[in-house]
Design a protein with these regions (language model features):
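Residue-level preference for short coil/turn positions at secondary-structure junctions
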Residues: 44-45, 82-85
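Beta-hairpin (beta-strand-turn-beta-strand) motif
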Residues: 54, 80, 92-94
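Short, structured interface segments
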Residues: 66-80
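Glycine-rich phosphate/diphosphate-binding loop of Rossmann-like nucleotide-binding domains
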Residues: 84-127
């Protein structure tokens, strides 16, 4: 996949009130950088920018762009204003932490306060 094959939906926020995200898995580091840089410099949008599922090389390169929040394999820039909701993220176990962390960064980029409860698997329902 060349950088020419990446098609960002820069009008997405206007249409559905959700920002475009860069799903890094399967892309080169250069493609991820190009996509995030294009969104950062887009004059028509000041919405949150989210890059998810970055590998170590992609994460390091994207981190150089000065994200507002970087956690796990997800980075975000230009967060939305604070919302009135606090959202709980509950994961079953350590295998789910990557997805829980991705949810945390995404929700916080959208302006929500979050809290996380981990390792609440089937054998631990009493911990709810």
């Amino acid at each position: 996949m060349s950088s020419k094959e990446i098609r960002l939906d820069l009008d997405r926020t206007r249409r559905i009130n959700m920002p475009e995200a860069v799903y890094c898995e399967g892309k080169t580091t250069d493609q991820c950088l190009e996509a995030v840089k294009e969104m950062l410099t887009n004059e028509n949008s000041s919405d949150a920018i989210i890059a998810t599922r970055a590998n170590e090389e992609q994460f390091s390169a994207l981190f150089e762009l000065g994200p507002t929040l970087a956690y796990g394999s997800t980075l975000s820039w230009r967060h939305r204003p604070a919302q009135k909701f606090t959202i709980g993220i509950v994961s079953a176990g350590t295998l789910d932490l990557r997805v829980a962390n991705e949810c945390k960064v995404t929700l916080e980029a959208l302006g929500h306060t979050t809290f996380t409860i981990t390792d609440v698997g089937v054998s631990g329902l009493h911990r709810l």
